[in-house]
Amino acid sequence: MEDIKIIKADYLIDNIDKAFLHWEGPWGKHLTFDEFCETLLPYRVDIEPLSHWRDSLSPEFSPTIDWLSHIDEYAYSPYQACQAVNDILYKSTVYANQIFHKFRHPLIARNAKDWNCVQYVYGVQYVMRDLGVPVHIDYTPQYGVRGNRHYWNSVLHYTGHSYPFQGYNSGPERSLDPHNGTIKVFRRSYARNRRWISEIVKDEQSHFPIEPLVE
């Protein structure tokens, strides 16, 4: 069922208000409106059940990283904030298996024993979004030299560059292994990719004559 048929106005208003506070925060104030809509505003990561996750995640993580906003090196750098938060997540993981998490929040620790890169990516997306750190989800559907897909996150820096990282594991710029032969990278988006659609339409039209001959 579509969200528009079940979601309540109060839920959307609450989500928007909290997202705007993060946009005004130290790690989000550099974002354009479109970037804000893609990274901090969304109330979902995928098709998971609706919940007031901003309220339930904040007590779990905000006290842990409040000190970041008081240090110049971290205060206005999404890159440094991302590094620090992901280090906290990494250290809170039992390293022997990298699958059991101390965090008890259901959105980021449910069925942890079955986690793969997708669950790590979704978990860190929730945490970063709740803290106001602008992060995307990127993926490759197929490696060039092995039979696997892979998902990872990318933090959007104030310079405009995106730096990839693996949630609960590596810091920015240490996520992609060039030896895996990444062929093509896609980015999860909440808005329609009009440029991509126009390229497809243009490519399809190029296979047909503009003025078909009629016999």
Task: Give the location of each predicted region.
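Hydrophobic/aromatic-rich core segments of domains that either
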Residues: D72-I88, N97-L107, A112-K113, V118-D203, ...
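N-terminal accessory/pre-domain segments preceding catalytic cores
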Residues: M1-Q83, A109, D130, I183-E215
